[in-house]
């Protein structure tokens, strides 16, 4: 005979792996060309001066310099710039 009553089987207990999104290099930080600045879904941040956009909307530095976050344009969107030295 069983020593314990049978435990129920739950159908929960799964979760997706975190995608490590977010800002990777903050304002006034020095970066090299190719450094990832922001990983994002969609475009909360837009590519500014010396910044490129990847297929998955990742922003990366096209030149070495200092990172700047600037709000501009008619909708006051946030742009990420890399200001060269």
UniProtKB/Swiss-Prot annotation:
It comes from the Bacteria. Keywords: Ribonucleoprotein, Ribosomal protein. Pfam families: Ribosomal_L27 (PF01016). InterPro entries: Ribosomal_bL27, Ribosomal_bL27_CS. GO terms for molecular function: structural constituent of ribosome. One of its GO terms (cellular component) is cytosolic large ribosomal subunit. GO terms for biological process: translation. Residues 1-23 are annotated as: Disordered. PANTHER family: LARGE RIBOSOMAL SUBUNIT PROTEIN BL27M (PTHR15893:SF0), RIBOSOMAL PROTEIN L27 (PTHR15893). Belongs to the bacterial ribosomal protein bL27 family. This is Large ribosomal subunit protein bL27.
């Amino acid at each position: 005979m069983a020593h314990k009553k049978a435990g129920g089987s739950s159908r929960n207990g799964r979760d997706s792996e975190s995608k490590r999104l977010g800002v990777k290099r903050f304002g006034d930080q020095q970066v090299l060309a190719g450094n990832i600045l922001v990983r994002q879904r969609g475009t909360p941040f837009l590519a500014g001066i010396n910044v490129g956009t990847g297929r998955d909307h990742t922003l990366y530095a096209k030149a070495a310099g200092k990172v700047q976050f600037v709000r501009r344009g008619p909708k006051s969107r946030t742009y990420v710039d890399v200001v060269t030295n």
